[in-house]
Amino acid sequence: MPPKLDPSQIVDVYVRVTGGEVGAASSLAPKIGPLGLAPKKIGEDIAKETAKEWKGLRVTVKLTVQNRQAKVTVVPSAAALVIKALKEPERDRKKVKNIKHNGNISFDDVTEIARIMRPRSIAKELSGTVREILGTCVSVGCTVDGKDPKDIQQEIQDGEVEIPEN
């Protein structure tokens, strides 16, 4: 049998959920059950936390557990931030699957997302992070300032587009 958990110890649990939906308690139970938390209640807390800004988007949620209390923090992926920047109307996730987003976002939005993602990026400079986000735009299927994101990546590579560090 595993050792008993110290209740004052801080434990981080990461869960991938769809915003605004109460996830299956059965998927949460193995992760947070041993920490002495009720999976159903945590599922409702996650749904409440993600309902406003992240409704219908797949996001990672960080649960910080201490003294049998869970604090919910949303850790959005680059794709979730790009889709949110597109400001598309919500869709019923049950009916519409594998959507190609064909909107357009500004280059300023891309740099803003890059600044948010900077701490989690592998790139040395902000320009590298911007190129990572442009790659995500390619995957999502949107354009940036009416251009193909691959073209903008090439312009950054060639030094035609400058990205200020601050």
From Swiss-Prot:
Matches recorded under SUPFAM superfamilies: Ribosomal L11/L12e N-terminal domain (SSF54747), Ribosomal protein L11, C-terminal domain (SSF46906)
Entry-linked InterPro entries: Ribosomal_uL11, Ribosomal_uL11_C, Ribosomal_uL11_C_sf, Ribosomal_uL11_CS, Ribosomal_uL11_N, Ribosomal_uL11_N_sf
Source species, domain of life: Eukaryota
Biological process, per Gene Ontology: translation
One Gene Ontology term of the molecular function aspect: rRNA binding
Cellular component GO terms, alphabetical: chloroplast; cytosolic large ribosomal subunit; cytosolic ribosome; endoplasmic reticulum; nucleolus; nucleus; plant-type vacuole; plasmodesma
UniProt keyword list: Ribonucleoprotein, Ribosomal protein, RNA-binding, rRNA-binding
Nucleotide-binding found in the keyword field: no
Record function comment: Binds directly to 26S ribosomal RNA.
Xref: PANTHER family: 60S RIBOSOMAL PROTEIN L12, LARGE RIBOSOMAL SUBUNIT PROTEIN UL11Y-RELATED
Entry similarity comment: Belongs to the universal ribosomal protein uL11 family.
Protein name listed in UniProt: Large ribosomal subunit protein uL11z
Organism listed in the record: Arabidopsis thaliana
